[in-house]
A protein has these predicted regions:
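Exposed, interaction-prone extracellular/peripheral surfaces
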Residues: 1-215
């Protein structure tokens, strides 16, 4: 996927994070990372273990992607809809990194809006030519429709799928991954226990913020 960014190194990067409650899975008895601690760990790029929770993985992936591209000097924006709506315009610099990490740290997977709804409600605010990274554990076919919608509007969709089966859920993403690949969209699949740095290296970034490992 790195070629997607090499083609236009000045393109804005937009991260769309799926915070719809019904698509996420967590193990109730696992550890919980307080929001303030999560922000501090991300900001200082410390390694830490993630719980068995697809949303924790999703926000950590989003944080790693945002931090990486901001360090490369690109403008990064973010959109999500959990217990609150987040719509951060694409900007550069450390201040933008702080805003993104703060919002991610306190975001909860309590939303009702699916990824397709997020895309349809927000793509008018995203400039053509932008790279749009969708981070989701959903295996619904509407993810492919969301990618199609972005592509038709001359944006460059990239999809990071969090594989729920590896967390104990019944919702695997293998079929959706194949569908997206057949449509020639860049896809990265993240599973529980993966080092996020390695998982994303196989996708589209070469050196994200030092990633979290779950044993």
């Amino acid at each position: 996927m790195v070629k997607e960014f090499d083609q236009d190194p000045q393109a804005d990067v937009w991260i769309l994070l799926d915070a719809q409650a019904s698509v996420h899975y967590s193990r109730p008895d696992d550890i919980v990372i307080p929001p303030a601690d999560r922000f501090w760990l991300w900001k200082n790029r410390y390694e830490f273990s993630l719980p068995t929770d697809t949303f924790e993985y999703s926000v950590s992936v989003a944080a790693s992607i945002a931090s990486y591209f901001l360090r490369q000097g690109l403008a990064v924006g973010m959109m999500s809809y959990g217990q609150m709506s987040i719509a951060l315009p694409a900007e550069r610099g450390e201040r933008q990194q702080t805003k993104i990490l703060e919002n991610l740290a306190f975001l909860k997977s309590e939303g009702e809006l699916p990824m397709l709804g997020l895309v349809e409600s927000q793509y008018s605010h995203i400039p053509r030519g932008s790279i749009v990274v969708m981070v989701t554990p959903s295996n619904h076919e509407t993810i492919a429709l969301a990618a199609d919608a972005l592509h038709l509007r001359r944006m460059k969709p990239v999809i990071v799928l969090i594989d729920g089966v590896s967390f104990g859920s019944e919702n695997g993403v293998e079929y959706l991954s194949l569908t997206l690949t057949e449509r020639q969209f860049p896809v990265s699949v993240v599973k529980k226990g993966m080092d996020l740095r390695q998982a994303l290296e196989r996708g589209f970034i070469e050196e994200p913020a030092r990633s979290q490992v779950v044993n």
